[in-house]
Amino acid sequence: MSKVVLGDKHIQELSTNKIIDLMESGLNMKFSAEQIAILNNDFTKPLLVNACAGSGKTTIFILMALIAIAKGNAEPNEILGITFSHKSKLDMGERYAKFVSELSDIGLNFSNGKPKFTTFHALFYQLLLQNPEYRSSKVLSSYRFFVRDLADQIKHPSNIITKDEMLAEMFDLNDYLINQGLTSDGVLPDSADGNLSTAIKLMAKYSRQSHGDEFYSDYVDVLNKYQDLKRQNSYIDFNDMKLLLLESMQTPEYLQYYQRIMSRFKIAVIDEFQDIDNLQWEIISKLLSPETLAHLIVIGDDDQSIYSFRGSNPKYILNYKRLLPNAQKHNLSTNYRTGEKILQKVIPLIKKNHVRLEKNLLAAKKDKGKFILYSTKKSGFSGDSKMLRHLVKQINDPKINNNDIAILVRYNSSRMLLADWLANQEIYADINNASAILQNNIVYRIITELMKAMWQDKYKYFSNQANRIGFRSYKNHTEKVESSADDKFNKLSKYLKAADDYNASTNTPYKRHDERVKVYFNSIQRFKTKISETDDEQKAAKLSKTMIKDLYKAATKLTDRYFDYMEEKNFMSKNEVNDIKKYLEEELGQYKNIDDFFFDEEHKKEILSDRMKQGKQEHRIQFLSLHQAKGLEFKYVYLYGLTDKEVDRHSLALNMWFPPEMAMDKYIKKWKLVYKEHYKFLEEALKAAHINDYRDITNNNAFNPINLDKTLNKDKEFKIFHNLYQEIENFSAIVEEERRLLYVGVTRAQQELNIRIAPDSNPLVFELNLPKKKKQTKK
């Protein structure tokens, strides 16, 4: 074994505390009591480092690795560090090299080599390549490489969302099934035993969206086609890296081979342990040697577990002591990132979570930080808000680097409108998500494409949105008109003429839709003629302004039924639809020429879609979702668009009454009490949470709410009640994850946190320690 030397002495001869003192001196750091306790780990038992946001998780891992090397517990290349992102992996490598270099300056010389820092995906892929069957495989980063072929498998298009959106929801569901270990074939839940109807019921339960059976039938066809395309082209995706590796591990010789490769690692550390999923744990716990597993180190923060929608499972960090017997737990309670005046605001919020590991939350930056609260009586987007004026002022301040400012949002719709508004001020946001660009939004596209269809006399735009005028049946009607005329129309006017002929010879209920379109189209075309014929500029401008209003009105009137249906079925938020419509109407009101509007919109979209072009702009801004922001930090943070879409004041009560992991007997006792004293509010809460199973109880005469114990002695009624219990527990867990999301957002801020509250704000915002309103003194 190579030695770590200090001058002409072997450092192994020194005590751990002496080595820690040397490292403090060489790295110019002062370690806290909590850090010193962790660094004194003797590598004989499993260890959980429960590290709060901003506590220096990467730093403590690298220091632990260096001490293990210095004490002779392991060579550098016998240490394995696993994380979830490529960025974190690079950060580990850079931090290790930096510390080794700085320590060499004081004569503390480490042997050559370094630990293996890797992501789960990279590690699994490297092992899979040892299998001859997969050596020629290529990595497929996204299903979108085959998007056209996959879209063709959708035989039951939705009246509500596009095929592209259907595919996104199908693959989100597939990720969840795989990461939770619910499927071994990568398509159907194993517990369905190949029975499609059973599988559909199970998938409907796992999906966060509401779909009919036809969606799940198409899901099966899409995923089977996807598997075929990957096989034909020798591709494996990130999920395959787990599924195929686990499958090959069922063969003893492969499992033993993989274990021999992994046996070189005497020390293993898993970072961001709160993000691990069932499959990753199953694989890594089988690959590591029993000796290494016996002192496995995991670092994470249960308060930052925010990826359950893709299958991450916080139960591993929450139950680590049960997972690995004799496990120790040490906390890192000090946040070195966020100023105390900001951190103190979020502590009451995160402590309201019922399921969390207890730890103190302390700020290293005492009496620092600025928490700015903006209050408004108006819901929705407002370009005239004080917070946005403050944001623009900071962006334009030459003393502030734009890279130090970030806007964090919960929903894409919030990101869209603000990013577009900023682009109008020539401030361009790095949105990191094409679907969050307003011009790509479905509500925006529906309205503007119908406006283009009527103004430019373009059939293709009308055809794109025909199903939003009269749903799928009207779209089918337009295709029949095309077929009967034997014409792929270029102009909307040609379609309307052909529709007149078709409707005259057939008894079709869709004649009324065609006539409505024709009335609006003819009105707009008359305006167009008048504008082109007048020589009076003022009159032309006045006509043009009126025409723009009528054009917008025509597009919205034609699609009213569609949007009403979407909102009623909870496929779209009424507030979001209204916000986009209102924003679009206000923006159109600033134009005298509709062609200028269409041109400017394309120009904005071009810049917002192209990072190269964004880089050439004078002002840019980081625009991230709360999920994307995890692991990052900024001097100035704006939390924007925290609406009550996911949790409202009614549904929040379910978490208070029925916290996650509540035992069934306690749940029954609580249900009786709540039902008796708060029945109306309980009903509103269940409706707001979209928990519809409660109707099975209220509509069932066999249920006696007064004598519930007797009712639950019946098998059928108990099963119904237990299903409701599970649905409420799932929703209560969602509420706690939403708290964690808000906690993550607040703790991204170093110096200043800006937050806006409005009538439609998420009620969790009010769990922050918000500044009290100053009382007016009577004169």
Residue map of PLM features:
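P-loop NTPase Walker
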Residues: 2-134, 259, 344-347, 744-747
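Helicase P-loop NTPase motor core
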Residues: 54-61, 65, 326-328, 334-427, ...
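Long, charged, helix-prone linker segments
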Residues: 760-779
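Conserved beta-strand -> loop -> alpha-helix junction used to position metal-binding or nucleic-acid-contacting
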Residues: 108-128, 426-454
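ATP-hydrolysis module of ASCE/P-loop NTPase motor domains
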Residues: 111, 132-221, 274, 329, ...
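Conserved helicase NTPase motor core
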Residues: 14-61, 80, 116, 211-319, ...
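Conserved short internal alpha-helix adjacent to the catalytic or cofactor-binding core
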Residues: 65, 423-424, 434-475
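Conserved helicase C-terminal RecA-like lobe
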Residues: 452-748, 752-754
